[in-house]
């Protein structure tokens, strides 16, 4: 029978790699709590119109990359989420979450895009994101950027730089759009097929082209920031001033437009040169009109999302050490007849918060194995202590506690006194 394997571009996350994921997620949860962000979890499958309306019909994601299908039960058009912001906004609108003021939310989870798998880019990938909804001020933009910047410090990430731009408001973009189209129409011979297709539908995205033959053209294109009015400029200046006051370095990138149509005013990316062409590890911006587009009352919002795989890849590139989780203790059990007593003792320890791994045979009828082989496995497990439940110890109602990592002498302890040892162990963590 043919062996079934994972879909190309959709990867299993196995130990010990999964420990790196847990470490990152724990760091994020701790940091989000400091900034008063609360967790939200939305469905992986959403109505297709949510993304068409929210992201824009002529975006690459909607045109080329979504996993969409028809529900066989009712004919509804459904899509595996390619990003999470639209789903978070849908949930906020559906459940009237802004009735009593703004909300700070964060999420973690898998996203799906049908694209060619390569380093840092997968068909199932994972994002962590933060959304501040109901806050119109530039301080909200700055705070959410500071949140991401603080995360890099928590993770020990280096060589990550911040790029900023402002997309202004819709009327300012319309004026820039007209000037941009007029400029590009004078250079039709330089435009590639994709740029010609976008010229009158989404010309701003042409500025984000990776085509080397078009780089000189886009460098000379009208800059959106030169079309901003006083209010938009002041908003952007306030964001930059707050970042400066916090010692956060940034650079202006007038070609930064992001891949979704819902952005306005501040947009930003955190980028690195250590991941080749997939150098953006986090991006976001303000999206004041998305809530209204999805059917809610107008409410401002700003957010970002980071690519988990890319962040972990960057940590690996920088050789950041992530502590491998290990049990506090490893139970060495020479005789299977002792298992009822041993497992009762281990359950009491676990109830007190002690993590214990018990040696178990890997094949039927194999037996418990020699003491020597069990001690080898105990040492390889990374546990701090071995708990030896030998026949002599059990006859005395005791267990031998042998340090494997910590200093100190091995000692015999009564089974009834293991609770005291557990309390001492926890206080020494």
Curated annotation (Swiss-Prot):
Entry-linked CDD domains: HisRS-like_core
Catalyzed reactions: tRNA(His) + L-histidine + ATP = L-histidyl-tRNA(His) + AMP + diphosphate + H(+)
Keyword ATP-binding found: yes
Residue pairs linked by disulfide bridges in the UniProt entry: none
Keyword list, A-Z: Aminoacyl-tRNA synthetase, ATP-binding, Cytoplasm, Ligase, Nucleotide-binding, Protein biosynthesis
Family stated for the protein in its record: Belongs to the class-II aminoacyl-tRNA synthetase family.
GO BP: histidyl-tRNA aminoacylation
A GO term for molecular function: histidine-tRNA ligase activity
Protein name per Swiss-Prot or TrEMBL: Histidine--tRNA ligase
Entries under Pfam families matching the protein: HGTP_anticodon, tRNA-synt_His
Quaternary structure and partners: Homodimer.
Documented EC number(s): 6.1.1.21
Subcellular localization: Cytoplasm
GO cellular component, as recorded: cytoplasm
């Amino acid at each position: 029978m043919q062996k079934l394997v994972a879909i190309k571009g959709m990867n299993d996350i196995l130990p010990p790699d999964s420990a790196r994921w847990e470490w990152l997620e724990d760091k994020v949860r701790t940091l989000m709590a400091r900034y008063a962000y609360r967790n939200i979890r939305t469905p992986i499958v959403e109505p297709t119109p949510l993304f068409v309306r929210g992201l824009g019909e002529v975006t690459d994601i909607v045109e080329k990359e979504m996993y969409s299908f028809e529900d066989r039960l009712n004919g509804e058009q459904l899509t595996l989420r390619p990003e999470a912001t639209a789903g978070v906004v849908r949930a906020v609108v559906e459940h009237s979450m802004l009735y009593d003021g703004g909300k700070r939310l964060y999420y973690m989870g898998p996203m799906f895009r049908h694209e060619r798998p390569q380093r840092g880019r997968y068909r199932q990938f994972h994002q962590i994101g933060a959304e501040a909804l109901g806050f119109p001020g530039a301080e909200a933009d700055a705070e959410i950027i500071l949140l991401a910047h603080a995360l890099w410090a928590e993770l020990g990430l280096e060589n990550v730089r911040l790029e900023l731009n402002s997309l202004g408001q819709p009327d300012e973009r319309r004026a820039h759009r007209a000037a941009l189209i007029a400029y590009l129409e004078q250079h039709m011979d330089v435009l590639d097929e994709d740029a010609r297709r976008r010229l009158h539908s989404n010309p701003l995205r042409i500025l984000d082209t990776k085509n080397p033959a078009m780089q000189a053209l886009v460098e000379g294109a009208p800059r959106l920031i030169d079309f901003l009015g006083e209010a938009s400029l002041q908003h952007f200046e306030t964001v930059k001033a707050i970042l400066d006051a916090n010692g956060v370095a940034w650079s202006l990138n007038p070609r930064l437009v992001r891949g979704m149509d819902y952005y306005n005013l501040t947009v930003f990316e955190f980028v690195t040169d250590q991941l080749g062409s997939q150098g953006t590890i986090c991006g976001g911006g303000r999206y004041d009109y998305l809530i209204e587009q999805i059917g809610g009352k107008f409410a401002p919002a700003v957010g970002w999302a980071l690519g988990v795989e890319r962040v972990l890849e960057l940590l690996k590139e920088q050789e950041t050490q992530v502590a491998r989780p290990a049990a506090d203790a490893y139970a060495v059990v020479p005789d299977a007849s002792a298992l009822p007593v041993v497992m009762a003792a281990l359950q009491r320890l676990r109830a007190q918060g002690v993590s214990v791994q018990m040696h178990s045979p890997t094949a039927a009828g194999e037996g418990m194995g020699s003491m020597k082989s069990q001690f080898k496995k105990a040492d390889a497990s990374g546990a701090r202590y071995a708990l030896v439940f030998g026949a002599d110890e059990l006859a005395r109602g005791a267990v031998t506690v042998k340090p494997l990592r910590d200093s100190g002498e091995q000692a015999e302890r009564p089974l009834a006194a293991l609770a005291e040892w557990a309390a001492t162990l926890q206080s020494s963590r």
